[in-house]
A protein has these predicted regions:
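Alpha-helical transmembrane segments and their membrane-interface boundaries
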Residues: 1-121, 135-271, 277-354
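Conserved catalytic neighborhood of penicillin-recognizing serine enzymes
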Residues: 131
Length: 354
């Protein structure tokens, strides 16, 4: 479906549903990402990736705004800050205990996602937990700056979402997504599978010096969002396509204004155009974390990390594409093995029917 949608993005798409509400969501995503990136660049914040990715995630995954959404988003970030201080500050001297606590938190959050009503709380918690554990594990990281940046970015995301939903409201009320009925065995399967694989990713990033592979880390975590093997396979294909699209666009932008990339007035319109294209693809797909969402988050991560005009751009893009591909292959292998293992037991059995 996403490949067909990708082809229709460049052509008349009479057989693709793109409503007035979809157009407004596209505009909200592009404007929010551009504003967030402008703020993080203007103030030269150390963890600009938070300021860019959080608004993009919130408005891409949740097309509405209300108090329930705001509470879940802010509460998740606040709880994560407290958890990270306790885990890294007090448990880092006991690696086994630390890993078990991280595993328990991942399982709890994926269980929230699997059950449905607290999906945003769980998904935001998974992303926060993964990125903050990665950043805080390196001695050069300033914990206070990291935690304040995380909370400030969260508040900024909620404020931008509220403002843009007020200024660019939907034309008609949106229908809530259909509720998926899941039995207890399926919920256990999804939460244990995703939690175990996420914990293994955490251990690998702790053992190896992978501080510059945030894109690869997020790729491995985000394809776990379907929380079952078949969904992870499809999600990984979408992820690779989205990352390649975004990297090619970023390369073109950097080549066009190579010596002037520090001029916001030149960069921001092109970044906004890339976000608008990716957001349009995302809302046309209507599959959640598809090609468009992968492209949106890749643009946010790469520009949020402040790409510099004098680095090797071709190597930078190829490095990210290669690292993401390797991360996805390894993650899919782990998902497959866990899927087979959990299906050996009736209490955690989950067979996807055709």
């Amino acid at each position: 479906m996403s490949i067909n949608t990708l082809a229709h993005v460049f052509t008349p798409h009479g057989n693709i549903v793109y409503t007035a509400n979809d157009f407004r969501q596209t505009v909200r995503i592009a404007v929010a990402g551009t504003i967030a990136l402008s703020i993080s660049t203007f103030y030269d914040v150390q963890y600009g990736v938070f300021f860019v990715v959080y608004p993009l995630m919130l408005m891409s995954l949740v097309p509405v705004f209300n108090r329930h959404v705001a509470r879940q988003f802010v509460f998740s970030a606040a709880v994560n800050c407290v958890e990270m201080v306790l885990i890294v500050g007090y448990l880092s001297q006991w690696p086994v205990i630390m890993t078990l606590v991280v595993f328990a938190l991942y399982v709890m959050r994926f269980r929230f996602m699997s059950q449905g009503p607290l999906f945003l709380l769980g998904s935001m918690g998974v992303v926060c937990q993964s990125t903050m554990l990665n950043f805080m594990s390196y001695p050069t990281s300033n914990w206070h700056t990291l935690m304040f940046s995380n909370m400030e970015a969260c508040v900024l995301a909620v404020a931008l979402s509220a403002l843009l939903h007020y200024l660019i409201p939907d034309v008609e009320p949106r229908k809530p997504p259909p509720r998926i009925e899941k039995d207890a065995a399926r919920i256990r399967h999804e939460s244990l599978l995703s939690g175990t694989v996420a914990t293994i990713i955490f251990v690998v990033f702790q053992i190896c010096d992978l501080s510059d592979l945030l894109s690869a880390l997020m790729a491995g975590i985000l394809i776990l969002f379907p929380m079952h093997y078949r969904g992870a396979v499809i999600s990984s294909i979408w992820r690779v396509a989205g990352v390649v699209l975004a990297c090619l666009y970023i390369l073109v932008v950097q080549l066009i204004i190579y010596d002037f990339s520090n001029h916001m007035i030149l960069m921001m319109p092109l970044i906004g155009l890339g976000l608008a294209f990716s957001a349009r693809l995302h809302v046309m797909e209507k599959v959640g974390a598809g090609v468009g969402f992968a492209s949106i988050t890749t643009i946010g991560i790469m520009f949020g990390q402040n790409l510099h005009p004098y680095q090797d751009l071709v190597f930078s893009d190829l490095y990210r594409i290669t690292s993401v591909t390797v991360s996805l292959v390894v993650t899919l292998t782990l998902v497959f093995l866990m899927h087979r293992l959990l299906n050996c037991f009736a209490a955690t059995r989950f067979v996807v029917s055709d």
